[in-house]
Amino acid sequence: MSDNRRSRMITEGPQRSPNRAMLRAVGFGDNDFTKPIVGVANGHSTLTPCNAGLGALAARAEAAIRAAGGMPQIFGTITVSDGISMGTEGMKYSLVSREVIADSIETVVNAQRMDGILAVGGCDKNMPGALIAMARLDIPAIFVYGGTIKPGHYKGRDLTIVSVFEAVGEYSAGRIDEHELLEIERHACPGVGSCGGMYTANTMSSAIEALGLSLPGSSTMAAEDEEKAISAARSGEVLVEAIRANRTARQMLTRKSFENAIAVVMALGGSTNAVLHLLAIAYAANVPLTIDDFETIRQRVPVLCDLKPSGRYVATDLHRVGGVPQVMKMLLNAGLLHGDCMTITGQTIAEVLADVPDEPPADQDVIRPFHKPLYPQGHLAILRGNLAEEGCVAKITGIKQRSITGPARVFDAEEECLEAILSGKIKPGDVVVIRYEGPKGGPGMREMLAPTSAIIGAGLGDSVGLITDGRFSGGTYGLVVGHVAPEAAVGGTIALVEEGDSITIDADARLLQLNVSDEELARRRAAWQPRPPRYTRGVLAKYARLVSSASLGAVTDRFDGESA
């Protein structure tokens, strides 16, 4: 069987002479039409430091593919900057961009009958978007992460972008002055690369490494280091090898590999967004995975890494002491990882990890020893109760108070809530409710980093709870609960909460409860009316019509009557 299994449909035979004529115009010669055509989905953009270095990586991968005997074809895909759009209407487009990225890659690869796909991405939605496309396509595929930004430094402490969001809250609370805020702003982002803590981008790059669709050790490299460029080139070579072996994406994307990815996310202390994205990738791969699987795995996997936002270190620190392979080796030795899962390299997880030390270096505390973890169980808890019949996600590390019962402070949009926090209207003991921010209601399920950072900055992180049908940034920590489902826009109980109602968040009991009688809830439900759509034309209107519940991954190709 030839290596150009798909592209031969557009390159072989007299009837394909017009096709070849066009390909000659973009660099194909007589001897190139039997070579596999390899797509390079390039997310390069100067919108954001996360993606500003991707062009060079795509070029290195392109050259390596060509040298290995493939015919690379570069095409663009989009990105939006979560950090820049955060706290604005623009953030409604962030999760939408995941679908646009997935759809665009799938569209180009299938339209051009490409034999393999290498995707280069950096900002948060690039990773799940590319993986969703790879899962749908089920062809040889590999992901190249753009790499993490190095930390900024100011007054002897490491800074990340989250430092600036929290500084806004400190400034509003009078804890720092305008000069201090400006200096933190100036020093937080010293170069290119994705946000530096174990936020969403680094969480998802690590999950992809655990899934076997990126090179071992590549997910925590700094964007500006030469090893990242070398890794991009090697990824191109590995992809051509995978095409020759017909090693396709779904051979890696199995039930066991998703369990591995969840275990790694828990051990790293990763972002709540991993729940949403892994559910969506699994759905695209036709792998049964539910929100409850995260809770099952959480209960047996400890948090081993002391990483921001709730910890002390950043991704480059993790890389320095062994990176994701070191964490995976520890999980494998503890029986918490499936070593027989295949990777795009052709090796199993166990084979990839064979030469990794059993324990991390002794002279560091980024990765804790297994007998002395940072936390004995994972940090992404799935809560249920009458406020979240379909479930919700709580991040329960880095908090002193694991439960709260307090009066609801209800806001129907993020902006209203942020103004209340910054003006001092939120008090210790309050439970903030931000609703109509779900996948359909927002639409787009905005991340609530601005309100949560303002709460932290105001010194209320240990005394105020926050629940939302929106999402949280990977930079969020505190007593926060997101992805509440059903969401307000479809009549979920969160829509029925009234100002001053008693709400309980209990991380240990995994409970999210509105302390109102069933009779009163029934009365409110009977009186509730759905709100008219916020958008009636354009991409947000289309997204609101198509998107599923957050408990199902907020996907846009799950249709009525389809089982979970």
UniProtKB/Swiss-Prot annotation:
<feature type="binding site">
    <location>
        <position position="447"/>
    </location>
    <ligand>
        <name>Mg(2+)</name>
    </ligand>
</feature>
<feature type="binding site">
    <location>
        <position position="82"/>
    </location>
    <ligand>
        <name>Mg(2+)</name>
    </ligand>
</feature>
<protein>
    <recommendedName>
        <fullName>Dihydroxy-acid dehydratase</fullName>
        <ecNumber>4.2.1.9</ecNumber>
    </recommendedName>
</protein>
<keyword id="KW-0460">Magnesium</keyword>
<dbReference type="GO" id="GO:0009097">
    <property type="term" value="P:isoleucine biosynthetic process"/>
</dbReference>
<dbReference type="InterPro" id="IPR037237">
    <property type="entry name" value="IlvD/EDD_N"/>
</dbReference>
<dbReference type="Pfam" id="PF00920">
    <property type="entry name" value="ILVD_EDD_N"/>
</dbReference>
<dbReference type="InterPro" id="IPR056740">
    <property type="entry name" value="ILV_EDD_C"/>
</dbReference>
<keyword id="KW-0100">Branched-chain amino acid biosynthesis</keyword>
<dbReference type="GO" id="GO:0000287">
    <property type="term" value="F:magnesium ion binding"/>
</dbReference>
<feature type="active site" description="Proton acceptor">
    <location>
        <position position="473"/>
    </location>
</feature>
<keyword id="KW-0408">Iron</keyword>
<dbReference type="InterPro" id="IPR004404">
    <property type="entry name" value="DihydroxyA_deHydtase"/>
</dbReference>
<dbReference type="GO" id="GO:0009099">
    <property type="term" value="P:L-valine biosynthetic process"/>
</dbReference>
<feature type="binding site" description="via carbamate group">
    <location>
        <position position="125"/>
    </location>
    <ligand>
        <name>Mg(2+)</name>
    </ligand>
</feature>
<feature type="modified residue" description="N6-carboxylysine">
    <location>
        <position position="125"/>
    </location>
</feature>
<comment type="subunit">
    <text>Homodimer.</text>
</comment>
<keyword id="KW-0001">2Fe-2S</keyword>
<dbReference type="InterPro" id="IPR000581">
    <property type="entry name" value="ILV_EDD_N"/>
</dbReference>
<dbReference type="Pfam" id="PF24877">
    <property type="entry name" value="ILV_EDD_C"/>
</dbReference>
<dbReference type="InterPro" id="IPR020558">
    <property type="entry name" value="DiOHA_6PGluconate_deHydtase_CS"/>
</dbReference>
<keyword id="KW-0028">Amino-acid biosynthesis</keyword>
<feature type="binding site">
    <location>
        <position position="124"/>
    </location>
    <ligand>
        <name>Mg(2+)</name>
    </ligand>
</feature>
<feature type="binding site">
    <location>
        <position position="195"/>
    </location>
    <ligand>
        <name>[2Fe-2S] cluster</name>
    </ligand>
</feature>
<keyword id="KW-0456">Lyase</keyword>
<dbReference type="InterPro" id="IPR050165">
    <property type="entry name" value="DHAD_IlvD/Edd"/>
</dbReference>
<comment type="pathway">
    <text>Amino-acid biosynthesis; L-valine biosynthesis; L-valine from pyruvate: step 3/4.</text>
</comment>
<dbReference type="GO" id="GO:0051537">
    <property type="term" value="F:2 iron, 2 sulfur cluster binding"/>
</dbReference>
<dbReference type="InterPro" id="IPR042096">
    <property type="entry name" value="Dihydro-acid_dehy_C"/>
</dbReference>
<comment type="similarity">
    <text>Belongs to the IlvD/Edd family.</text>
</comment>
<keyword id="KW-0479">Metal-binding</keyword>
<feature type="binding site">
    <location>
        <position position="123"/>
    </location>
    <ligand>
        <name>[2Fe-2S] cluster</name>
    </ligand>
</feature>
<dbReference type="GO" id="GO:0004160">
    <property type="term" value="F:dihydroxy-acid dehydratase activity"/>
</dbReference>
<keyword id="KW-0411">Iron-sulfur</keyword>
<comment type="pathway">
    <text>Amino-acid biosynthesis; L-isoleucine biosynthesis; L-isoleucine from 2-oxobutanoate: step 3/4.</text>
</comment>
<comment type="function">
    <text>Functions in the biosynthesis of branched-chain amino acids. Catalyzes the dehydration of (2R,3R)-2,3-dihydroxy-3-methylpentanoate (2,3-dihydroxy-3-methylvalerate) into 2-oxo-3-methylpentanoate (2-oxo-3-methylvalerate) and of (2R)-2,3-dihydroxy-3-methylbutanoate (2,3-dihydroxyisovalerate) into 2-oxo-3-methylbutanoate (2-oxoisovalerate), the penultimate precursor to L-isoleucine and L-valine, respectively.</text>
</comment>
<feature type="binding site">
    <location>
        <position position="50"/>
    </location>
    <ligand>
        <name>[2Fe-2S] cluster</name>
    </ligand>
</feature>
